Amino acid sequence: QIALARLLAGALSGTPADAAADLAVQCVPVADAVTDEAAKAFAGAEDCFTLGRGVTAAIAFECGLKLQETCYIKARAYHSSDFYHGPMAMIGKGTKVILFASGKALGGNAAPLREDSVKCANKMLELGADLYIVTDDAALFAGLPAKVLAVPGGKTEAETAQSLALAAQMLACKTSCLRGLNPDSPRALKKVTVTV
């Protein structure tokens, strides 16, 4: 939605679309293609974990929320660094895990985040998880027996986050449809909440 708004604003103002909007346009067909098999796998899932670190943690939380509200999957989202402190004990053979990982980082120093993403992926696999990695840097996970859902990356982690989020939303939407549900009309979603 944000990318479409940027494209529309650019068209109406006569100014070129920004890089993030262009990236989203490139990402749609790729994300559509790479999420097909994952959605089939998640269609039968009762629970899963979604993990990320840095900016990708927000995407992990959003993906978990979408899987909960549109697919009725008991999805639990964590920062990957926090996951090591207890929740990891819930991972066993066949536990579905989605790891969101970017090859970039805010501030430019991606090395620690990249290393942590690989460490997390290896640990999940060691514990027997059925691991799906949504990333703009498939080479980072080369050789791992995980399902890598590679999407185009941007020049920055913030731009790349948009591509990862698009893949997360497509995965939830497709999974919901495969479960015979309507992702546009979840049973308990309220558009307006009142907080006192």
Model-derived regions: residue spans:
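A SIS-like phosphosugar-recognition module
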Residues: 1-196
